[in-house]
Regions:
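Conserved N-terminal catalytic core of the sugar/cofactor nucleotidyltransferase
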Residues: 1-47, 51, 56-58
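Conserved donor-nucleotide/metal-binding helix-loop-beta segment in metal-dependent transferases, i.e.
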Residues: 52-83
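Conserved beta-strand termini and adjacent loop/short-helix elements that scaffold enzyme active sites
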Residues: 19-21, 73, 156-158
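Short coil/turn connectors at secondary-structure junctions
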Residues: 12-15, 39-42, 66-70, 82, ...
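Active-site glycine-centered loops adjacent to acidic/histidine catalytic or metal-binding residues
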Residues: 49, 76, 167
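Short, conserved catalytic or adaptor-binding loops enriched in Gly and charged residues
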Residues: 7-13, 88-90, 146-147
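Catalytic-core segments of class I nucleotidyltransferases/pyrophosphorylases
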Residues: 44, 60, 64, 92-168
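Ligand/cofactor pocket segment of small-molecule handling proteins
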Residues: 78, 82-94, 99
Length: 168
């Protein structure tokens, strides 16, 4: 239905390229499929089940003008065990200590929302991932590995309205 509606994008003043993920192997797998298309450019992954009231202009400017290898958006939630979570490093303000997928005992209530600002460095990380217990290549694990290998990951917080429509 998406391709049917948007087509090649010309009716909307844009050019759309479709890249298909033939099996549900996780977000990191889907990102990896785009490697040749992206080349050496910084890029944004915006999961279709996320709705954000604020536009991405300020976040995009922050990321494109930085030397960060990734930037994630965080939002406080009441039920953090249902989301990928970021634990901030209290000893180093502005730094992330750990990123994890749907922990049973979350160390924070900061959900990693489904909008990721990335550089091509993520592809080498994804190439070395193993499938999770769910059989997926997890974006949270890729981001955590990117960070643990000494790459710079920034974050910003979403204070306005945000909804993950894929999470009841």
């Amino acid at each position: 239905k998406v391709k049917e509606y948007y087509g090649d994008g010309s009716n909307f003043g844009v050019k759309i390229t479709y890249i298909y993920q033939d099996q549900p192997k996780g977000i990191s797998h889907a990102i990896r499929l785009c490697k040749d298309f992206i080349g050496n450019d910084k890029f944004i992954v915006y999961l279709g089940d996320n709705v954000l009231r604020k536009d991405l202009t300020d976040y995009t400017k922050k990321f494109t003008s930085s030397d960060s290898d990734a930037m994630i958006l965080l939002c406080e939630v009441d039920d953090p065990q249902r989301f990928g979570i970021a634990q901030l490093d209290l000893d180093n303000p502005g730094k992330i200590k750990k990123i994890m997928e749907k922990p049973k005992d979350p160390p924070s209530n900061l959900a990693v929302i489904g909008i990721y600002f990335l550089t091509p460095k993520i592809f080498d990380i994804i190439d070395n991932l193993k499938p999770s217990w769910r059989g997926e290549y997890e974006i949270t694990e890729a981001l955590d590995n990117l960070m643990n290998q000494g790459n710079k990951i920034e974050y910003d917080t979403v204070t306005g309205w945000w909804k993950d429509t894929g999470t009841p």
